[in-house]
Amino acid sequence: MAPALTLEKPVETNAFPRKAASVETSENYEGNYKFAPIEEAQVSRAMIKRYFNTMYDRAISDVVIVGAGSAGLSCAYSLATQRPDLKITIVEAGVAPGGGAWLGGQLMTPMVIRKPADAFLRELGVPYEDEGNFVVVKHAALFTSTLLSKVLAKPNVVMMNATAVEDLIVHEDFAGQQRVAGVVTNWTLVALNHDTQSCMDPNTITAPVIVSATGHDGPMGAFSAKRLVSTGLLKELGNMRGLDMNRAEPAIVNGTREVVPGLILTGMELSEHDGSNRMGPTFGAMIGSGHKAAHEAIRILDRHKVVNGKVVA
């Protein structure tokens, strides 16, 4: 678990630099609300310039996190907080980040988090009801939206959502080992339609550390773990076992690690790799596993020499 941090003060609107509008505007809600004028091309260029500048810059990243569910976002928050010098790039296949953390079990809204993971809620400023051995957030979206907003506010974090990881970059490293050296990406709509169209080649992001947090459900579930098998880096999957909350959560947190050089598995993806139990609608392990993945990523970076996104010593 990451050490407790002082809560960040909310950013006030007047802290942002403002340029004067070219014409008079008005926030009069009595029928006289006036916007500053804009050209359609200005909107397009404003988006394109920033997005593709981000793609250009993050073609080499320090850490890529695959999946923006509760484990991936917890990892991103912890990592960005501890190491603001790192370029952290989150790749999320869904249009809406958050994975399965927008609801609790069976589409119900409350979220259950076992102690001691409740410390993270206090760090984020998320209110909850204390039930003794666990706490309950009144709506899972309160936790997820708070965490997501804080992650995206970190200046060293970018997220590319609606973007799927289609493959892993695997190179022989300085020691002669096969090492995961980055990810292969594409628009999710393209990735899901390779059977309907031809020749839609992907893009790449190079990074010395990949944290895969793709869960176990859905079309992209446990993607990296499954790809390790098909590439021959892993003999077979352990396959997730049946539900046992008391066995599952500590197994996921304690088992979070670098499973092959350059690739850390976290969250429920690890259960498919290791053959551990599922825990169902309790989220403490996702927080703890994400934090441990951040610590593992820092440990890997600290013990290797990295040049242009590649581990060289």
From Swiss-Prot:
Q: How is it modified after translation?
A: During the catalytic reaction, a sulfide is transferred from Cys-199 to a reaction intermediate, generating a dehydroalanine residue.
Cellular-component GO terms for this entry: cytosol; nucleus
Q: Which PANTHER family match?
A: THIAMINE THIAZOLE SYNTHASE (PTHR43422:SF3)
Q: In the Enzyme Commission scheme, what number(s) does this protein have?
A: 2.4.2.60
Organism, as annotated: Coprinopsis cinerea (strain Okayama-7 / 130 / ATCC MYA-4618 / FGSC 9003)
Q: How is the cofactor bound?
A: Binds 1 Fe cation per subunit.
The protein's GO terms of the molecular function aspect are: cysteine-dependent adenosine diphosphate thiazole synthase activity; iron ion binding
Which transformation does this protein catalyse, written as a reaction?
[ADP-thiazole synthase]-L-cysteine + glycine + NAD(+) = [ADP-thiazole synthase]-dehydroalanine + ADP-5-ethyl-4-methylthiazole-2-carboxylate + nicotinamide + 3 H2O + 2 H(+)
Q: What name goes with this protein?
A: Thiamine thiazole synthase
Q: Which residues carry this modification: 2,3-didehydroalanine (Cys)?
A: C199
Could you say which cofactors this protein requires? Fe cation
The subunit field of the Swiss-Prot or TrEMBL record says: Homooctamer.
Q: List residues binding substrate.
A: A71, E92, A93, G100, V165, D201, H216, M268, R278, M279, G280
* Record localization: Cytoplasm; Nucleus
**Pfam families, from UniProt?**
Thi4
